């Protein structure tokens, strides 16, 4: 089962050190998601992360960074829904319904399905699927190894994610809420 970490939406002091330590401890993939931020901040963060880990980083915006920093790939979402012209490489995308999963899974290396549980980072963002719906979707082949669970995943329910048949779990609030990320850093 893949373990994917999504960055918090803002930059913070020593974020690169935490990310590097997590890679050293076995983090599979990092999704660099910093909506509404200037690309120079992403460039700065990437320059501080050892190059050996760049091939395990996926960007949610500023797609040119994929080639410039030899990153793993790009992630499509509502802000950046289109594959760049002539793009070749890893693609993932966000899905918020089982119908979207069916639609996008065939064109992506994997897709996120959210929210699977009540979100930790977005307090009013509740689970969109019952356990029965998830099991039914797995049995129907909708949820499989190409579908990554997102939303409210922590140490208390990560085993459920595996048992449901997801290909992995994407973590956000369960990890980043343990750090003081509220201090924006002007790189």
Give the residues covered by each predicted segment.
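Conserved N-terminal beta1-alpha1 strand-loop-helix module at the mouth
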Residues: 1-110, 136-139, 143-145, 154-168, ...
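Short, well-structured alpha-helical patches and their helix-loop capping segments
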Residues: 93-96, 125-129
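Non-cysteine beta-strand/loop elements that form the S-adenosyl-L-methionine
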Residues: 109-117
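A short acidic, helix-capping loop that chelates divalent metal ions and anchors anionic groups
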Residues: 117-124
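Glycine-rich S-adenosyl-L-methionine
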Residues: 129-136
